[in-house]
């Protein structure tokens, strides 16, 4: 449910995934506040998410965007898709993603779609299992994307050439 997208001067795409009103009950009544979940990416393999809380919606969104910019990770992409199928989990949410052919598009729902789009993934097949809580789905998706290894990374780790491991 990506509701809003902006492009900053430093070419970061920002998406607002969810805004939630929460309340704290005190002796005098309820204190309302808001939470915002956002993702930020450069469209070329860098992505981060942020979760902000404040008494007003704009302040919560601004805090979430700042946290997202500070918590960016780099993922290995293969011409707009993934190098290999990958699974991720966080809490009760599980996600599965696999590379797709050119022209397939982003087959993903809700929060996972927002993360993949700002990360620069253009062709992917994905499925979310278990809890569909947006925060857990975003964390599981980013965990899975961080686990993607390029052939160059695998070759370097094994001390072989790329040609040797691709056989």
Curated annotation (Swiss-Prot):
GO biological process: translation
GO cellular component, one term: small ribosomal subunit
Pfam families linked: Ribosomal_S5, Ribosomal_S5_C
InterPro entries: Ribosomal_Su5_D2-typ_SF (IPR020568), Ribosomal_uS5 (IPR000851), Ribosomal_uS5_bac-type (IPR005712), Ribosomal_uS5_C (IPR005324), Ribosomal_uS5_N (IPR013810), Ribosomal_uS5_N_CS (IPR018192), Ribsml_uS5_D2-typ_fold_subgr (IPR014721)
Free-text comment about domains: The N-terminal domain interacts with the head of the 30S subunit; the C-terminal domain interacts with the body and contacts protein S4. The interaction surface between S4 and S5 is involved in control of translational fidelity.
Subunit structure: Part of the 30S ribosomal subunit. Contacts proteins S4 and S8.
Annotated family: Belongs to the universal ribosomal protein uS5 family.
Entry protein name: Small ribosomal subunit protein uS5
Species the sequence originates in: Vibrio vulnificus (strain YJ016)
The encoding gene: rpsE
